[in-house]
């Protein structure tokens, strides 16, 4: 008997195929329309997932849809600008304004999700996430934020925008760690969502490093990291377990602190 392919699996399979075309196959290699289509896909996936799976609270997912829409608009501007104007995208640009506003939208959704997963005060979980976030934030400070602050070639606005990206990533990192140490249920949608956040953070960090070194030339490998972020987030919305993502679970032994 042939097993029926789930919608989220089909979504990932089609996304992987389009990604392969984007990376390896002319004339699709590095194509703006292809990556823009991939960037739009999580927005559609979230809308479809909410309608099909009917989570008890749609608020977090609506914020996620807003954040992904802003990310897609930033991509649309960034990849269309050279074709429309025959020049490199300036920095900072409208695209940067759109990208930076992604962070508060995603954080709003994650904050709502965390509150619903943890209806009782969880001091130990909060302290654990703070400890781990501070450690990784220090790495971001040393590798990215401090070098941008001391870069005399940047004027005030470019410097502020450059710093906004790693600061936004630190906030998302804090939310991802808080999800990882909380008492909520661990379902496939949970792992897909946290995987999406990790993909974004790792790719943004790598992009920041190569940009600081002056070695960024539109490397496709970085685009693959952002595409992974799109697809994993979209799959998290399509998976039926997204209904249970906001549900708390009995106390788990996942603590660093004994509180």
Give the positions of each predicted feature.
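Polytopic alpha-helical membrane-helix bundles and their juxtamembrane interface segments
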Residues: 1-259
């Amino acid at each position: 008997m042939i097993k029926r392919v789930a919608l989220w699996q089909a979504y990932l399979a089609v996304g992987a195929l389009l990604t392969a075309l984007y990376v390896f196959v002319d004339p699709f290699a590095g194509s703006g329309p292809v990556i823009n289509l991939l960037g739009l896909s999580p927005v559609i996936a979230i809308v479809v997932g909410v309608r099909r799976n009917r989570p008890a609270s749609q608020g977090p997912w609506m914020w996620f849809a807003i954040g992904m829409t802003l990310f897609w608009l930033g991509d649309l501007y960034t990849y269309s600008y050279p074709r429309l104007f025959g020049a490199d995208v300036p920095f900072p640009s409208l695209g940067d304004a759109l990208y930076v506003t992604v962070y508060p939208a995603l954080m709003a959704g994650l904050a709502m999700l965390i509150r619903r997963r943890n209806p009782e005060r969880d001091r130990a979980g909060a302290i654990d996430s703070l400890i781990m976030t501070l450690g990784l934030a220090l790495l971001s400070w040393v590798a990215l934020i401090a070098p941008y602050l001391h870069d005399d070639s940047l004027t005030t606005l470019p410097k502020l925008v450059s710093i906004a990206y790693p600061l936004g990533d630190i906030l998302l990192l804090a939310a991802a760690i808080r999800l990882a140490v909380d008492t909520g249920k661990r379902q496939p949608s949970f792992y897909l969502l946290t995987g999406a956040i990790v993909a974004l953070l790792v790719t943004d960090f790598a992009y920041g490093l190569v940009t600081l070194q002056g070695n960024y030339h539109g490397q496709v490998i970085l685009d693959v990291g952002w595409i992974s972020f799109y697809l994993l987030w979209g799959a998290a919305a399509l998976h039926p377990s997204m209904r249970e993502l906001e549900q708390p679970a009995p106390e788990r032994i996942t603590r660093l602190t004994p509180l």
